[in-house]
Amino acid sequence: MKIFLCIIAVVSLQGVVAFHVEREYAWKNITYEGIDPASYNIENSIPTAFAHDAASKKIFITVPRRNQIPFTLTELDTTKHPERSPPLSKFPGSDKLISVYQPVIDECRRLWIADVGQVEYKGDEQKYPKQKAAIIAYDLTKDNYPEIDRYEIPNNVAGNSLGFGGFAVDVTNPKEGCGNTFVYITNFEDNTLIVYDQEKKDSWKISHGSFKPEHDSTLSHNGEQYKYRVGIFGIALGDRDPEGNRPAYYIAGSSTKLFEISTKILKQKGAKFDPVNLGNRGPHSEAIALAYDPKTKVIFFAEADSRQISCWNIQKPLNHKNTDVIYASSKFIFGTDISVDSESQLWFLSNGQPPIDNLKLTFDKPHIRLMRVDTAKAIRRTKCEVKRVKP
């Protein structure tokens, strides 16, 4: 998702709302296990996203390919490395990957990635020749994570793959098997949503006005203001109905509105796309990442301009009065991913590197942080907590 993936700002006043958050990891710079630091560029080692496998206690972290980056897909064994600044290990079987922005783990413990098939810089065209973007799945239940699915996205569907944003994996009925699966990938540059039908090995793209940016958004950093304008970026899936369909919640990066569409529509190639505008989260609440927690019925947003992680309970109307803040810290700079794992733990990552030209970085203090908080604790005593009425 280009360097713009670094734009999710989660910077706020230190200690304002962070009562239940535990800082899991903090790095001054990324190191790689078994690799001499002199052989790679630490300034280019910018993690953008992750996926936590609760069963194995491993975290899979993506580092988009830039000059002198050894691995674009890595893993971190949290049992083996309990320290605060552990090295990242190479993901098995990832030698041929070009550049990966985000990993997702589904209910069948498959790790899904979208390899964009090209690099964002000049000079390594022979080493990393441009190829078709591909959706790839690995089996986390087996040793060395064998590749179990690969699909090359046609160019007319993928569009500019450097604009790939968030994506979601939709297993229709996990209790009956994992075969009937769909993948939804946003493209914030082309303002499209890509749908992959794993069973039929087919894909298509959807365009809609709600995917487009509504306005220029503003990012403030060190007293300066920077403008950006992006379309559909974040997508998250809600609860299944008896037929296995779910609401798909999505946001454009330069918009404060939240939209919903049933996956029943997404799964039908050529179906009429008629989303529901759920409401407006309020001024300066732009976000490009969101995550849904089925346990609490809450959607969490990593906001940009307001520099906070906010929440909204889907059981309430969506408006500014029904949203709240669950985390804010001046040290959590430029969050790049947010997700809820299978144990209802909310995780969010910041890499401390905004997409600003000629940005000068210092490596004397940790600027890359991975945080974790229990979702129920995070919303306690906020507007997002809906207490059950005892019969």
Curated annotation (Swiss-Prot):
> What is a single Pfam family found in this protein's UniProt entry?
MRJP
**UniProt keyword terms in alphabetical order:** Glycoprotein, Secreted, Signal
Signal peptide annotation: 1-18
Tissue specificity annotation: Female salivary gland (at protein level).
Q: Where in the cell is it found?
A: Secreted
Q: Which residues are sugar-modified?
A: N29
What functional role does this protein have? Probably modulates blood feeding of sand flies on vertebrate species by binding and sequestering different mediators involved in the host response. Binds biogenic amines. Binds serotonin and dopamine with high affinity. Binds adrenaline, octopamine and adrenaline with medium affinity. Binds histamine with low affinity.
The molecule here is called Yellow-related salivary protein ASP4
Species of origin reads Phlebotomus orientalis
Q: What does the organism's lineage look like at the top?
A: Eukaryota, Metazoa, Ecdysozoa, Arthropoda, Hexapoda
